[in-house]
Design a protein with these regions (language model features):
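Switch/communication elements of ASCE P-loop NTPase nucleotide-binding domains
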Residues: 1-36, 253-319
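Extended helical coiled-coil dimerization/tether regions that scaffold
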Residues: 88-90, 100, 131-274, 279-287
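Short flexible/disordered coil segments
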Residues: 41-52, 217-232, 309-313, 317
């Protein structure tokens, strides 16, 4: 699916809305894990989402979706009162976000969450169902929980959101880990959800590229992925980047054909803009994971020929 149009015509809003809804299943999993660890804390095991003590899974999800809405779309105060978003995962599973203006609520345009009966039944039936072992959440309980949840949503895809304005994040690559590590929880929450997810993903995956894309390609031989497909993806990546990416000694580099390299923060604007699109596409191709990619402005700062190549790479990975 492609969106084109004038600036401020709503393309990013639609992309963020898809991300918001398609990651709800992941939110439910993390909230269920947090609920279990809140009831039975385990030393050294930290939950990724904070949760109110003793709260039900349904209420925890409603609270989190309100917070997630604000961090994804901004304050609801300036939005029209009749604004709503509704996403149908199946004929019987949906989530609707709307605004309520009522004296019962302390703020104007209160964010109201409506869920389908099937989803509500699942949340009630699976309230406090994950058990905790001395090592953390029971793997078997979590496996069954995910299986049942994915059946409700008819969706097991992970979502990878690649926002616009990537070059600034790439430009600060050397300082990025330090900047993010020194931010407190409040500052991290001030980042919009999509950007935060993107930042954390690239910080987590950088070490995987210590041997460059060729190192990842080598591991693909053990996964049963077609060598022809890998070579084709590597060739397109080389044509777009005019080099290959490598993460070495805490430094991001573009390695040129003659073996010399350029630090990523001194590379061209086009390379900075596209490098992590290419890295993420190739990484998940090799991992053979079912991924929904949401990519904003993949053609940004690229020559028309390179725009053609990146379109071909996206199609190759998608198919």
């Amino acid at each position: 699916m492609n969106f084109t149009g004038f600036q401020a015509s709503g393309k990013s809003t639609i992309a963020k809305a898809i991300y918001y809804f398609r990651t709800i299943k992941d939110d439910i999993i993390e909230l269920a894990k947090s609920q279990a660890l809140d009831a039975t804390p385990v030393y050294g095991v930290k939950s990724t989402l904070s949760i109110e003590h003793g709260i039900t899974l349904r209420k925890a999800l409603e609270n989190y979706l309100r917070e997630k809405f604000l961090r994804t779309f901004g304050s609801s105060w300036g939005m029209p009162n009749d604004m709503y978003m509704e996403y149908h995962f199946t004929k019987t599973c949906y989530v609707k976000i709307s605004l309520e203006n009522d004296s019962r609520y302390s703020t104007p345009n209160y964010i109201w969450i409506t869920m389908s009966n099937e989803l509500i039944r699942f949340l009630k039936a699976n309230n406090h169902t994950l058990s905790v072992t001395p090592l953390g959440i029971s793997e078997e309980d979590l496996r069954i929980f995910k299986k049942n949840l994915y059946e409700i949503f008819e969706d097991s895809c992970s979502v990878v959101y690649i926002p616009a304005g990537r070059s600034m994040i790439t430009l600060l690559s050397q300082q990025l880990s330090y900047i993010y590590a020194t931010m407190d929880d409040m500052q991290k929450r001030s980042l919009d959800t999509c950007t935060k997810d993107y930042l954390e993903r690239i910080l987590r995956l950088k070490p995987e590229f210590s041997e460059g894309l060729q190192g990842l390609a080598y591991s693909s031989g053990r996964s049963g992925l077609s060598p022809r497909l890998v070579v084709q993806a590597l060739d397109l990546t080389q044509k777009i980047l005019r080099g290959t990416y490598r993460y070495s000694n805490g430094e991001e580099q573009i390695v040129l054909e003659d073996g010399k390299y350029v630090k990523i923060n001194f590379s061209s604007s086009g390379q900075q803009e596209c490098v992590w699109i290419l890295n993420l596409l190739f990484y998940y191709l090799v991992q053979q994971k079912e991924i929904l990619f949401i990519i904003e402005e993949p053609e940004s700062h690229l020559f028309p020929e390179s725009q053609k190549y990146i379109t071909e790479l996206i199609a190759l990975v998608n198919n």
